[in-house]
From Swiss-Prot:
Protein's membrane topology: Multi-pass membrane protein
Organism for this UniProt entry: Caenorhabditis elegans
Protein name, per record: Dolichyl-diphosphooligosaccharide--protein glycosyltransferase subunit 2
Recorded superkingdom: Eukaryota
Main localisation: endoplasmic reticulum
Transmembrane segments: 188-208, 223-243, 245-265
């Protein structure tokens, strides 16, 4: 089945490729940006002939080329698969652009040279312009140089990478905005909070003054002064936490001093209990 399809394709191509083609109504010219094409500003060129004078254009002008492709046998218009304009620079580099037909089968290339320069890879100066026409059904492919053009195309410079750019100019002044201090409460609220925090100690001092402190029943033990010194030290740690220490430093000192005060207090209570048992 595949072999049959291949043979049918070859046969159809062989039968189709029986006609020669010709390029008719070939016109070329340089137009201004908003100028309409007409017989006055376009030159007609016969197939396989060449314009005697060189075309000259700058980047603001348009290159206009129009033509039709028809069979020689019946002059019917055809649309070959490959229709190109080829621009060959003096250094041998070439640029090939596609020419597409309109709905009526007419081929038109109309482009501002500044826009076309993007595809010319920074080429500028003199070019040889050729028309290329080809198709599997065409017996005589066309490669026709019909004109020379001197085009002053703009050179598209490649941008310098940002890492390689050097700017000799003063830099903007760096201004640092410091964080605004947080709004603190009024002095009245601060004093009231301090009094509330110190109120348990004040109440303790008042109650001690009313009840009285009896040092006569204190046992003769070295743990007694250690216990009282530990209590005073704990109050001192609280005070330092208030003015300087953070929570972690406070807990570190409080763990050591609190354990020592706890042991000393336990020993004092045991000594008091033993002295009471002896007195009874």
């Amino acid at each position: 089945m595949k072999l049959l399809l291949v043979l049918l394709t070859i046969a159809s191509v062989a039968l189709a490729a029986v006609d020669d083609v010709a390029v008719n109504n070939f016109k070329v010219g340089i137009l201004a940006k908003d100028q309409q094409p007409s017989d006055e500003n376009l030159k007609t060129v016969a197939l396989f002939s060449k314009l005697p004078n060189e075309l000259k254009a700058d980047a603001s002008q348009r290159l206009y080329v129009s033509f039709t492709v028809a069979k020689k046998s019946d002059n019917a218009k055809v649309k070959p698969h490959q229709v190109f304009l080829r621009f060959v620079a003096q250094n041998g580099e070439d640029v090939v652009v596609v020419v597409n037909p309109d709905a009526n089968g007419n081929y038109v290339y109309d482009n501002v040279l500044r826009t076309a320069a993007k595809s010319f890879r920074n080429l500028s100066g003199q070019f040889k312009i050729s028309l290329l026409v080809g198709d599997v059904t065409i017996k005589n492919p066309i490669n026709w140089q019909f004109a020379n053009i001197d085009a002053a195309l703009p050179v598209a410079y490649e941008p310098t990478p940002k890492s390689q750019q050097v700017h000799f100019e003063p830099l903007n002044e760096i201004s640092h905005i410091f964080r605004q201090p947080e709004k603190r409460p009024s002095a009245l609220i601060s004093d009231l909070f301090t009094i509330i925090c110190l109120s348990p100690l004040l109440i303790l001092v008042v109650l001690w003054s009313q009840v009285g402190i009896n040092f006569q029943n204190a046992p003769a033990s070295p743990w007694v002064p250690i216990f009282h010194v530990g209590l005073i030290g704990i109050f001192g740690i609280y005070f330092m936490f208030w003015v300087q220490f953070d929570m972690f430093v406070t807990l570190k000192y409080l763990a050591v001093l609190g354990f020592l005060t706890f042991v000393a207090g336990n020993r004092v209570l045991r000594a008091i209990s033993e002295s009471k048992q002896k007195s009874e």
